[in-house]
Structure formats: structure tokens, C-alpha cells
């Protein structure tokens, strides 16, 4: 069932099922941690784990994550930091450094915490000695079991600040995959498609942020558009693990070099500075795109509270359950293609913010890229869902949209 993570690309040659020698120390400690997990309660560290205390909410938290230091972020080969998600509340910098720092390859770790209460937001960053080391750890551990947890590692390249995002190596073409069996991992899904299509770049199974269990769907990324198109037909109904898959189109990512470096909102980006705001404004929405299409694309980054495309308007709003998910979605999806058109993302209006929403026309000609705030990777709180989610979508009324044949209306599996 492909339980072993892929071997390091530049390590010593190993036979089937063998572990690279430079990972032996880590895996031995992982086994020890896993034995403790049976006594672990949800949200608490395993017995004997030396957890660092959360910083006091009354004092500013010192930034520990280097984010690549003074390197020029324009070259993909120089990025040496990974984003890690789905962290449990007790997983702190000490945990990350014990996992990734045993070989001396990780130089720093940072868990993003809520400014008000000091508790983890569920994600963080790990900095490595160089790009090659970071890439090897990404390929080796992404999708592999996390020590002392039922969850798998969720890793990706760290996104840089606004105007500093690294250039992509090329366009990406994505296939939506539904009806996945509960045991399907990122690695298993990747290998299922890679056995047929050589241009597969990776796959992601979407997990519930609370339980860590699969939601029953995911996404597969291709470098070759023709293989993506073939896969949507040829892989539909094919088995991955114990169930036949259901495939369909998803958003395609264009090269990031085509995007403006920054966009300054003439009315001020109040949504970015509001720590309770979890709403993303989606501009330049194609007429064929439906709310279900937005759910399938934006839902891969976390739990959605509300999705709305106002009738007669070529824009939409996506509200997440927490700020961290919204930040990651805005960072990754801005400028990607949906329904044959590049969407433009910015922070929408918080339910508690009654200021006028910037006119959608401002976004029609090419709104720019909003990454993480220039001052660093901010920590944000959770936004309570509004009593009437449609209340702050007012002012957008008119006709409807056509029917777009995507994996819209996908029903999440009941575990």
C-alpha cells in the first residue's frame, strides 16, 4: 500500500523497502514516539514530550523563522524553506526541530500562533541549509506518518511575501479526484497517476483539519496539459486502493511571472489588517463558474463557512473557518485559471467591517498578487461565522450564471 516514503533522490541506493541511512536516526525516534500515541489525548502532547509553553498573549512574539534570510527569492533554486500544515496544538518549534533537525539539515522552525491567545494556528515553517535539502525532505516526508500522530505530514514550499513570490517553473494543470478511499495518501494518489502519465508533479489528498482524516477527494498536478485532459477521461472509474475514482477539471495555475508584483487598494486593505477576517474576494470570475466550482477549488485549503457568487456579477466571496486557511488559499490561488480565465484575489470585507466593498471593476484589468504581509508571516485568530452570511454580500444582484461541468456539488464522504 506504499507505506514507505519515497527514498531520498541524492542518497545512497537502496533496495525495495529499505530506509536511507541518513534517515535511520529519525525513524528510530519516530517509532518510539508512535508507541506513546495510544495514550495521547486529542490536543495534548504525548507522555514525556517536552513541550515549550505558549508565549504570553500580552507580549509580542519574537520572530524565529528566517524565511530564507537575505537570499534573492527570484530564483526557485534558492528557496530553502517549507510550509507545514495540519499541526496539532501541542506541536511546537521543539517538535519540528526534533523531527527535521536530527541530521543537522534543518536550521530553524517557526509555528504560527494567534496574536491574542498565543496558541498555534495549525501551521508553520521549517528552514533548511539549502534548497536541495529542503526538496529532499519535501519529497521524503510529505504524506508520510507524523510522529505521535494519526496524521500524515502536509508539506509544501513556503510562499514568500507580497511582491517576492518565487517564479514558477512552468504552468500547472490540475485534475480533481473524488470518491477516494479513506486510506489513500498523497503518495499513493501520486503514484497511481504517475504510473500512467510521466508529467505528474504531485498530488494532494484533502484532509479534515480537526480529525486529520481524508475528506475523500484531492487534486493531481500535471506539467503537460494534454496528459491532464487525457487523465480526466482515462482515469475516471479507475481504482486507487479499494474504490473507483471520479475525475474532473480543477483550476489550472499559470506561470507566476505573468502576475503584477503588487496591487495597492485605493481604499486601503482593511481586510488584510483585520485578524478576524477570513473572507477572500474573487474577481474576474468567468460566467461559467458556479459556487460549487469555487467550493471544489478553495475547499482544498481548509474548512469553508460560506461561498457566494452574487447574481449578475463576475466576482465572488469565499469565507473560511480560520484565517490561516484563507491566507494560504489567497497566496496559492491568486492568478490561477478557473473556467478559462485568471481569477484575481484580495481580502474581502469582514462581517464585522461595514465599510464599502471596493468596486469589482477595480479588479477587472489585472488585480495584483497578495501574498503574506510584507512584515512577515502574521498569526491570526478565528472568525466567528456571521448570523447571516449573505448580509455582507449585499449590493450585488442580477442575473445568474450558466452551468459549468466541473466537480461541482461534490459531497464530502462521511467517515
UniProtKB/Swiss-Prot annotation:
Pfam families found in the cross-reference section: RRM_1
GO cellular component, one term: nucleus
UniProt note on tissues of expression: Mostly expressed in seedlings and stems, and, to a lower extent, in leaves and flowers.
Any GO BP: mRNA processing
Localization (cell): Nucleus
Ranges where the RRM domain occurs: 80-160, 173-252, 278-350
Assembly and interaction partners: Interacts with the poly(A) tail of mRNA in nucleus.
Free-text function comment from the UniProt entry: Heterogeneous nuclear ribonucleoprotein (hnRNP)-protein binding the poly(A) tail of mRNA and probably involved in some steps of pre-mRNA maturation.
Name listed for the protein in its UniProt record: Polyadenylate-binding protein RBP45C
Amino acid at each position: 500500500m506504499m507505506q514507505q516514503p519515497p527514498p531520498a533522490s541524492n542518497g545512497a541506493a537502496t533496495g525495495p523497502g529499505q530506509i536511507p541511512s541518513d534517515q535511520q536516526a529519525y525513524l528510530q525516534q519516530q517509532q518510539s514516539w508512535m508507541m506513546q500515541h495510544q495514550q495521547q489525548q486529542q490536543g495534548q502532547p504525548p507522555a514525556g514530550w517536552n513541550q515549550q509553553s505558549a508565549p504570553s498573549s500580552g507580549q509580542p512574539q519574537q520572530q524565529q523563522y528566517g524565511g530564507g534570510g537575505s537570499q534573492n527569492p527570484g530564483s526557485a533554486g534558492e528557496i530553502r524553506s517549507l510550509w507545514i500544515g495540519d499541526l496539532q496544538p501541542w506541536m511546537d518549534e521543539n517538535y519540528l526541530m526534533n523531527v527535521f533537525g536530527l541530521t543537522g539539515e534543518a536550521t530553524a522552525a517557526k509555528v504560527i500562533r494567534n496574536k491574542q491567545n498565543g496558541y498555534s494556528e495549525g501551521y508553520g515553517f521549517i528552514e533548511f541549509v539549502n534548497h536541495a535539502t529542503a526538496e529532499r525532505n519535501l519529497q521524503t516526508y510529505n504524506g508520510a506518518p507524523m510522529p505521535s500522530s494519526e496524521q500524515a505530514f502536509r508539506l509544501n514550499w513556503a510562499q514568500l511575501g507580497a511582491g517576492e513570490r518565487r517564479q514558477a517553473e512552468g504552468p500547472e494543470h490540475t485534475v480533481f479526484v473524488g470518491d477516494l478511499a479513506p486510506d489513500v495518501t498523497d503518495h499513493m494518489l501520486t503514484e497511481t497517476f504517475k504510473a500512467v502519465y510521466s508529467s505528474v508533479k504531485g498530488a494532494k489528498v484533502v484532509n479534515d483539519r480537526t480529525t486529520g482524516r481524508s475528506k475523500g477527494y484531492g487534486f493531481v498536478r500535471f506539467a503537460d496539459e494534454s496528459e491532464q485532459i487525457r487523465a480526466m477521461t482515462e482515469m475516471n472509474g479507475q481504482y486507487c486502493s479499494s474504490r473507483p475514482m471520479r475525475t474532473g477539471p480543477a483550476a489550472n495555475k499559470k506561470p507566476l511571472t505573468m502576475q503584477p508584483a503588487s496591487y495597492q487598494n485605493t481604499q486601503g486593505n482593511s481586510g488584510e489588517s483585520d485578524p478576524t477576517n477570513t473572507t477572500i474576494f474573487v474577481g474576474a470570475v468567468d460566467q461559467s463558474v458556479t459556487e460549487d466550482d469555487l467550493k471544489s477549488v478553495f475547499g482544498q485549503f481548509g474548512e469553508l463557512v460560506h461561498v457566494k457568487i452574487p447574481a449578475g456579477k463576475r466576482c465572488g466571496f469565499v469565507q473560511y473557518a480560520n484565517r490561516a486557511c484563507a491566507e494560504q488559499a489567497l497566496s496559492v490561488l491568486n492568478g490561477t485559471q478557473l473556467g478559462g480565465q485568471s481569477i484575481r484575489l484580495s481580502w474581502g470585507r469582514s462581517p464585522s467591517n461595514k465599510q464599502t466593498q471596493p468596486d469589482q471593476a477595480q479588479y477587472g484589468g489585472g488585480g495584483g498578487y497578495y501574498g503574506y504581509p510584507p512584515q512577515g508571516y502574521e498569526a491570526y485568530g478565528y472568525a466567528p461565522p456571521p448570523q447571516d452570511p449573505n448580509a455582507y454580500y449585499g449590493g450585488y444582484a442580477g442575473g445568474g450564471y450558466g452551468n459549468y461541468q466541473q466537480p461541482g456539488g461534490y459531497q464530502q464522504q462521511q467517515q
